[in-house]
């Protein structure tokens, strides 16, 4: 048996040796032996050494933005330029397989350290989040526009469209949004104050915008000092992914004079990116800085530089180990405007001085005043109480500083008066709202009416939407009794609104309500809590404290020094405190010298516009909108608090008075009327009209500006020279006479409309910033001609 086995083995060996496979088998055995030996050497013999010196190599490509082009005036004067500055950046280099909890802790610890370093050296982190702190230290949305607010909420929840939001998500308050993000980012908002939490959320949210492409860096602080840059570099080993980069920041010298023309730059939003064409999306990314308004926006494609590209390797710590290739970026093109910089600044200052003069001519040393008693609007005064109130209402001074531990004497005195008054008013309001037999609205004091109006119209309708305006029936008897006749109380009105399902209970919280009484109790509880922290309600309280003299003008003016709005003047400050300096005289002098401007006070009048054109070429030499703003604070990384202040201020600063204001053209239209009269044959160069100061052909009789005087007999040239109204009243009237000798206003206005169109007044002017369409009314009255 064994012999048979041995014979078979011999046969197999003989067959194998004679086969051509033997060569392959030998080669396979040799290579396998070499591979096994090499693995043994690497893993066993040198394994520990290689582990200690291991570096992970990752290939990355990063785009480098081109420098934005400059903007010059017609004479080559710089209006917008770029400046190199240090920025603190972070790149998310934490491995993607790291647990969320661990990753949050690493990032939060890193950002906390960055925040400490930045603030210790006098700088600040980014503040371009959609939520800010109001004057009472509570969270509020930076956007007041509802669509913009919802767009922000959709971005927070990762929704592409506003319509994708649930009702609960749409109704979230700013505080609920912050708490939602704190939970996502692993931040314990109960352990820190609101300001710290908001800064941390700002940085985490900014990083989150780049989460889909982690190799992009996120700016945490821009335009930082050398001290901050040095401190970051010294601690870089303990700050994962944090670095100092040189950025090109947009600068606007004399920004307030040109902001309405130039606009500002900022990071492109998701909505702006989505609106781009497919070709444009190839040139832009979500980290790009683009023009947000004005010339910066209109000529963005011209000003934008061409991006460069760098391809490199990084190790497992994010350090660059090798640069593979580099393409240099190219600078954008410059833009030259027809504007004359010096003329623009001079026109702005001239307009500001003119407005200040008007304010001073109307300013009256009384705290309260009823303008309805005046028969002629030219006699209406501005009570100084309104001016004092403007310091708070328009946030020239910061009322949230009044109650701080380091508050100054005037701040403390005002705050003590305010807290006592607020407690009294809230108690009275709640008592009336709980009283079924509360006085009717018409029987309330003027002050109490203002509080009730604020609660119903501003808070419940506009701000929170609890009282649904679209559900209210305008012809409903109870609605009329409240809104028009004023014969019922707010208690009765709100209870009726509940019975008619005009109240949105989903906005009162998560509680379930089974009866009308429970709903009303829920509304009152909501109001009581909301009003305690409502800065706009606080402003209303201050208004009546000032009107009553409980908070004095001297106290308000002293706070201007205490908060550094004006440089400290010890004599004036002490005089305001001890009563030796008259507050009215102090304010009058500050307005006269433009240390306090009409734009800051936002009294009427507080705004205006000037346009200067070259009559030979049509070039726009100056285009002033007053008041202006500091567009440097909105460019690059937006100052959200400043933006909100501008957006909610009473001066309506973002509205361009020079290009968007719709108003009657006044005497400038006389050239068109004269052209129409000459071309249509109603007058010639020698036709005269006698001006007695009043046009008595119609009743009531419109007056010339020179009334009770008159210009006498004038021809068309003289009528333009003296800007005589009566000449053009008569001309307009004559153009409206039909073939039967009857006056037809449509006939006259059709002729005027024809020539207005010939002058181009029926279309946009062609300037490259937003303008309002000219509207030629279809049916004018004789007084409009």
Describe every region a protein language model picked out:
Residues 352, 675-682, 730-734:
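Short glycine/serine- and small hydrophobic-enriched flexible loop segments
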Residues 93-115, 588-589, 637-666:
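Short, solvent-exposed cationic patches
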Residues 328-332, 652-660, 701, 709-714, ...:
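Flexible glycine/proline-enriched surface loops and loop-helix/loop-strand junctions
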Residues 1-591, 599-609, 615, 628, ...:
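Membrane-proximal periplasmic segments of bacterial cell-envelope enzymes
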Residues 333-338, 602-608, 641-669, 685-689, ...:
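Short active-site loop at a secondary-structure junction
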Residues 774-783:
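Conserved small/polar residues in nucleotide/adenosyl-binding loops
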Residues 626, 634-637, 663-725, 761-771:
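Short, glycine/proline-biased beta-turn/loop segments that scaffold the active-site neighborhood
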């Amino acid at each position: 048996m064994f012999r048979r086995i041995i014979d078979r083995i011999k046969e197999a060996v003989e067959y194998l040796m004679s086969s051509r496979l033997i060569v392959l088998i030998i080669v396979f055995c040799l290579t396998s032996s070499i591979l096994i030996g090499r693995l043994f050497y690497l893993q066993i013999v040198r394994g520990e050494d290689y582990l200690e010196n291991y570096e992970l190599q990752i290939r990355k490509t990063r785009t480098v933005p081109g420098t934005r082009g400059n903007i010059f005036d017609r004479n080559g004067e710089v209006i917008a330029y770029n400046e190199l500055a240090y920025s603190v950046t972070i790149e998310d280099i934490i491995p993607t397989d790291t647990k969320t909890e661990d990753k949050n802790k690493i990032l939060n610890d890193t950002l906390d350290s960055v925040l400490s370093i930045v603030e210790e050296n006098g700088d600040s982190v980014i503040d371009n989040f959609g939520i800010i702190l109001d004057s009472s230290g509570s969270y509020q949305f930076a956007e007041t526009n509802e669509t913009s607010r919802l767009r922000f909420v959709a971005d927070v929840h990762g929704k592409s469209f506003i319509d994708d939001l649930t009702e609960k998500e749409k109704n979230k308050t700013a505080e609920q949004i912050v708490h939602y993000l704190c939970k996502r980012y692993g931040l314990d908002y109960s352990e820190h104050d609101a300001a710290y939490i908001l800064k941390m959320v700002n940085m985490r949210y900014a990083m989150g915008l780049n989460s889909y492409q982690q190799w992009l860096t996120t700016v945490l602080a821009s335009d930082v000092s050398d001290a901050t840059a040095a401190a970051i570099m010294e601690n870089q080993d303990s700050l994962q992914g944090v670095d100092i980069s040189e950025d090109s920041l947009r600068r606007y010298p004399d920004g307030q004079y040109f902001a309405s023309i130039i606009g500002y730059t900022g990071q492109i939003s998701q909505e702006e990116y989505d609106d781009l064409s497919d070709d444009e999306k190839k040139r832009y990314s979500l980290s790009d800085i683009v023009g947000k308004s004005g010339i910066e926006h209109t000529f963005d494609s011209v000003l934008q530089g061409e991006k460069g590209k760098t391809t490199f390797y990084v190790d497992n710590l994010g350090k660059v180990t090798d640069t593979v290739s580099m393409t240099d970026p190219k600078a954008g093109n410059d833009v030259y405007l027809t504007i004359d910089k010096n003329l623009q600044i001079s026109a702005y200052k001239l307009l500001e001085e003119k407005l200040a003069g008007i304010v001073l001519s109307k300013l009256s040393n009384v705290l309260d005043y009823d303008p309805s008693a005046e028969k002629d609007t030219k006699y209406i005064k501005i009570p100084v109480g309104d001016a004092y109130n403007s310091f708070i209402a328009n946030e020239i001074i910061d009322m949230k500083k009044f109650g701080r531990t380091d508050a100054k004497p005037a701040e403390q005195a005002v705050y003590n008066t305010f807290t006592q008054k607020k407690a009294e008013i809230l108690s009275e309001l709640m008592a009336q709202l709980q009283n079924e037999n509360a006085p009717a609205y018409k029987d309330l004091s003027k002050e109490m009416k203002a509080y009730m109006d604020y609660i119903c119209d501003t808070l419940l309708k506009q701000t929170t939407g609890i009282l649904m305006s679209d559900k209210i029936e305008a012809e409903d008897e109870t609605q009329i009794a409240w809104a028009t006749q004023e014969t019922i109380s707010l208690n009765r009105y709100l209870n009726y609104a509940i019975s008619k399902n005009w109240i949105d209970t989903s906005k009162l919280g998560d509680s379930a309500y089974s009866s009308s009484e429970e709903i009303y109790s829920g509304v009152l509880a909501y109001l009581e809590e909301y009003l305690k922290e409502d800065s706009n309600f606080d402003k209303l309280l201050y208004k009546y404290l000032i009107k009553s003299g409980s908070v004095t003008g001297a106290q308000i003016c002293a706070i201007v020094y205490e908060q550094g709005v004006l440089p400290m003047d010890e004599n004036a400050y002490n005089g305001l405190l001890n009563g030796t300096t008259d507050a009215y005289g102090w304010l009058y002098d500050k307005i006269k010298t433009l240390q306090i401007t009409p734009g800051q006070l936002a009294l009427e009048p507080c705004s205006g516009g000037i346009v200067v054109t070259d009559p030979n070429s049509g070039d726009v030499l100056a285009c002033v909108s007053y008041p202006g703003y500091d567009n440097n604070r909105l460019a690059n990384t937006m100052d959200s608090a400043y933006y909100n202040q501008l957006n909610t201020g009473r001066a309506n600063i973002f509205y361009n008075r020079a290009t968007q204001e719709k108003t009657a053209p006044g005497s400038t239209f006389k050239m068109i009327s004269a052209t129409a009269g000459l071309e249509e044959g109603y007058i010639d160069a020698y036709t005269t009209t006698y001006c007695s100061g009043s046009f008595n052909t119609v009743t009531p009789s419109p007056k010339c500006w020179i009334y009770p005087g008159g210009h006498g007999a004038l021809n068309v040239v003289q009528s333009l020279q003296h800007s005589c109204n009566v000449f053009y009243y008569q001309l307009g009237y004559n153009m409206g006479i039909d073939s039967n000798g009857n006056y037809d206003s449509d006939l006259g206005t059709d002729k005027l409309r024809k020539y207005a169109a010939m002058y181009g007044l029926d279309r946009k002017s062609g300037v490259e910033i937003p303008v309002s369409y000219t509207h030629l009314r279809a049916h004018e009255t004789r007084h409009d001609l």
